C-alpha cells in the first residue's frame, strides 16, 4: 500500500503548482493524473496572462510557482496590455507554444525530487473521523495520505456538447471522472453545475492571411518571471479579422440546433467569455465581433480563433467560419464544443482552501467555480503551500485582499461563493494601486522565501533590487537642481515649467511629463541604473500621495482582519443578530471580522455585536 504526505489529483495548471509546492518543501508527494502525456495541457487558448490574470501569474512567480518561468521559455508573442494607462491596470499577456508549454511542464514535474506520478483515475476519497486518509483508484488500489488536494478541472461528470450531440468526457479525447464527483456528493458537499466552451481549431494552410490585419508583440518582449533576465526568442504575429452580418445570420439559423438555446445545457456559462452564439443573441445591434487568430505553436499548422467559442453543430460552424474575411476556404481541424461539469460551492472552504467538512482535504481550480489557467495556478500554489503547512502542523498562509490578487480571488470565493465561472479583473481589487504587477516581488517574495519555495539565488537578487530601489529614491531626493538658465532650457525642451527655486530630482520626477530617463541630463551616473529599478522608482514617486492614502486604507482594513474568530466559535449562540445574518455566518464561518464584514447582509451593527461577544468570551 502506497503512503505519501500529500496526494494531488489532476495534472492541469492547479495540480502542477500544487504538487510542485508540496514536493519542493520536502514532502513526499504523489500526482495522480489520467494521462501523463497531458500534464500541463492547455485545454482552451494557447495564452497566459491578460487583464488582472497577468498579476496572478507574477504573484505565482514570486511565491515560488512555475507558470511564469514556463511562459517565458515557451512564449511566441509577448505584450503588455493597457501600457498607456496607469500602472495599476497594466497587465502582461503572452501567446505560448501549446506543445512546448505542455512538454516543459511535464519535464519539470517528472524531474522534481520528492514527487511521484501515477496514471490512474481516483474513484473514492477515504475518510476517517472527518479527516482524509487516502484515495481509492480505478484499479482498486488504495493510496494513503495525510493531505489530499483535488484539482480535477472540468473532468467531474464532464459532458461535451456539439450541436445536439453530447457525450461524457473531461475534455475532448479524455474520459470524465464520475466516481470522484459521486464521492464528494456522498460526503455531503454542496455542488453545482457550470459550463464553459472552446473554439474550433483551424488549419493554417487554409487561411488567407493577406486579407487580415497583423498584430505584433512588444519589442523588446518583457518577461513574466522576475527571474528571467530577458527573452531572446523570435516572436510570431497574430492576425485580426471580424464576423459580419452574414456570419450572424448563419449563427441565428443554427440556434434551433444549439444546445445552449434548446435548453440541453443546464450549467451556467462564463459571463465574461460568452460563446459567439451568445454574443450574437445578446448584442443583436452589433454588426461585427473581433476575432484574433492565434498560432498554436512554431511547429504546427493549428490556429486558435480567439473570440468565437461555440457549441453549434459542426456544419454550422463551418458555414459560419467561411463567411468571415480570410477564412473563406478554411478547414476545421477540430470543432468547437461546450462542456458541462460539476463544481463544489467554494464557501465550503476555509481561506486556506482546506474544506470545512473534512480535515486535510483541499480544493483548487475549476472545482471551486473559477475559469482560467491563471486562477487555477494561483489556487493550486496556495493549496500546495497550505497542505504542506497542514502536514507539518503549522498555521496556514492566508493572503489578505491587501496582499495580492490571489488574496482577492480566494476571499471572493470562500466569502461570497459563485454561481458562474469566476474570472479575475482589476476592478475586483479595491487596493489595485498597491497590487501592481511591477511590485509583486516587493509584496510577496519574502513570503515565498519563508515557506521554502524561493531559492537563495532568487532571494538574494530580490534583496539587491529592493536595496537598489531604496538607494535610488534616497539619491534623487538628495540631488538638487539649481534654477539656472541651462537647467531651465532642459526643462523647457521637455515641455515642463521652469524652476524658480532649488528642487530635488525627486520633485522634478513628480511632474507628469517627466520620466526617469529625463533625469539623466542632470546626473549622467543615473544611466547605469537598471530599467526595472527606474520604472519602480518612477511609479513610487509619481503616485506617492495616492499610494500613501491607499496604505492608510489598508491599515484600517487590517484592524478588522486581525480580529480572528477561534475555530470553535459558535455564531449560533451570539445574541442580538438577525436570523438572516446568523444563518449566513453559520454557513460561511468567517475566519476574521474582516471576512465577516464582506458577507452580504452583515451590517456594521452586526459587526459591533460580534466584537462585543468576542470580548465577553475572552478572545480579545
Question: Residue spans of the language-model regions?
Answer:
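Beta1/beta-strand and adjacent pyrophosphate-binding region of the FAD-binding site
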Residues: 2-14
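Core beta-strand elements of the Rossmann-like FAD/NAD(P) dinucleotide-binding domain
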Residues: 2-4, 138-147
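Short hydrophobic core segments
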Residues: 9, 142-153
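Conserved N-terminal/central alpha/beta ligand/cofactor-binding core
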Residues: 20-124, 151-171, 175, 179-181, ...
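An anion/pyrophosphate-binding glycine-rich loop and adjacent beta-alpha core
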Residues: 37, 182-318, 415-488, 492-499, ...
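Conserved beta-strand-loop-beta-strand element in the redox core of flavoprotein oxidoreductases
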Residues: 126-142
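A glycine-rich dinucleotide-binding beta-alpha-beta segment and adjacent secondary-structure elements
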Residues: 304-370, 398-411, 530-584, 589
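Extended, charge-enriched "interface" segments that sit outside catalytic cores
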Residues: 428, 434, 445-606, 612-620
